[in-house]
């Protein structure tokens, strides 16, 4: 299956930000990767506009991406390219990022409400584009940076499921898009080797939303790239820095492994038991806390015989649902409740809160308060990075 290089993918993900200006869109579509307009001036490519913002507040229609037919060397290939977050539309994109509820996509899988709304607002135009190009499509390339990466993930999943075309996904600094069910299902639909998730170590955006949202490919690290910039600076999220990190490299060369064994159970237990201080401004803390939260919730679910993913479907907030599960864990046997206690102590310490002395103090109300503070802190770091784009 044809595959574009990291350098080309990063160039397209960077230059697509011009999509908000109709004149610059025409210049973008003159890149050699796309089919040119015919002699009469008619272009086979389509400029996409999406609804971004809140459901009522700052709900605007804005240039968001393109559907493009491949040019020389890319014949019979389709490109779906989406821009990332920008503040040029009165920060409506930030509201899209902040709509962190769960909704179901067309396959009934749980995904991020804001990202799903943004994608489905463009879907009629995307469907028309595919109807106009029903020929022998060799491959569909879906790509984007930041918010654009999240939307590209939903687009790639839709293409693979609906049209069964070979599909490639390329994302840079993308946030999490769906829950465990979606991550597992979309990995099966696209296949792990066709999913290129690139992220910097200190980019805060791929760290959100917190669990139950998870990255795809399922059980895959993606293309991890070391970065030393402070988490709070937002510098590691800039597309220009991603372009610099991947230039002159192949996908196989972008295979660094995170320096800590975040997904090994014994290592997670060791981190939870450790007396070493934790700092919410550290990228390592967010990796550890994400793995530890999943580890503890799954321990509770196994003993209490509950489906974690089923719990997250419903009207209550995610903080309410996770607090419910953790509070249930406090009441279970010591071999389970101790992990809830250690987890909450770690989070409270990192957030500068008064640490609970014992598990009796860890009421459902307090647990919820801690989780809300944790979520607010994670979202603040991500939104700070987005505002600096």
Model-inferred region functions:
Residues 1-39:
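Charged, compositionally biased non-catalytic regions
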Residues 15, 70, 83, 200-201:
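Structured loops at beta-to-helix junctions and adjacent beta-edge loops in soluble globular domains
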Residues 38-143, 160-167, 189-194:
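A conserved cap/lid and substrate-binding interface adjacent to the catalytic center
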Residues 76-77, 124-139, 157-389:
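Serine hydrolase/lipase
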Residues 85-87, 149, 176-177:
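Short, solvent-exposed loop/turn segments at secondary-structure junctions
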Residues 88-90, 152, 180, 210:
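Active-site-proximal flexible loops/turns
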Residues 123, 152-153:
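Short, hydrophobic/amphipathic alpha-helical packing segments
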Residues 143-148, 152:
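Gly/Ala-rich beta-loop-alpha elbow adjacent to hydrolase catalytic centers
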């Amino acid at each position: 299956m044809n595959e574009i290089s990291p350098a080309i993918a990063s160039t397209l993900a960077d230059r697509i930000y011009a999509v908000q200006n109709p004149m610059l869109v025409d210049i973008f579509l003159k890149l050699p990767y796309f089919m040119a307009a015919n002699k009469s001036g008619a272009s086979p490519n389509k400029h996409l506009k999406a609804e971004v913002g809140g459901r009522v507040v700052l709900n605007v229609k804005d240039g968001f991406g393109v559907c493009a037919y491949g040019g020389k060397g890319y014949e019979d290939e389709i490109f779906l390219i989406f821009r990332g977050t920008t503040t040029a539309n009165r920060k409506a994109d930030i509201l899209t990022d902040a709509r962190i509820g769960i909704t179901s996509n067309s396959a009934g899988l749980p995904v991020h409400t804001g990202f799903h709304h943004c994608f489905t607002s463009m879907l009629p135009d995307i469907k028309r584009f595919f109807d106009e190009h029903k020929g022998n499509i060799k491959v569909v390339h879906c790509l984007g940076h930041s918010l654009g990466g999240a939307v590209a993930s939903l687009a790639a999943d839709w293409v693979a499921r609906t049209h069964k075309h070979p599909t490639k996904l390329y994302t840079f600094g993308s946030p999490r898009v769906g829950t465990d069910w979606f991550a597992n299902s979309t990995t099966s639909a696209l296949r792990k080797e066709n999913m290129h998730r690139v992220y910097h170590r200190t980019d805060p955006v791929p760290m959100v939303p917190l669990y139950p949202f998870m990255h795809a490919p399922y059980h895959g690290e993606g293309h991890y790239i070391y970065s030393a910039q402070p988490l709070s600076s937002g510098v590691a999220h800039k597309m220009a820095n991603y372009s610099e990190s991947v230039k002159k490299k192949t996908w196989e060369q972008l295979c660094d492994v995170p320096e800590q064994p975040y997904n090994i159970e014994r290592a997670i237990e060791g981190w939870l038991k450790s007396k070493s201080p934790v700092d919410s401004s550290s990228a390592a803390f967010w990796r550890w806390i994400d793995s530890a939260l999943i580890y503890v919730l799954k321990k509770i679910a196994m003993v209490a015989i509950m489906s974690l993913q089923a719990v997250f479907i419903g009207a209550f907030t995610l903080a309410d649902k996770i607090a419910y599960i953790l509070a249930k864990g406090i009441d279970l046997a010591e071999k389970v409740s101790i992990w809830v206690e250690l987890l909450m102590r770690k989070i409270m310490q990192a957030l500068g809160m008064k640490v609970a002395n014992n598990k009796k103090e860890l009421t459902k109300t307090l647990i919820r308060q801690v989780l809300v503070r944790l979520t607010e802190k994670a979202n603040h770091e991500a939104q700070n990075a987005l505002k600096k784009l």
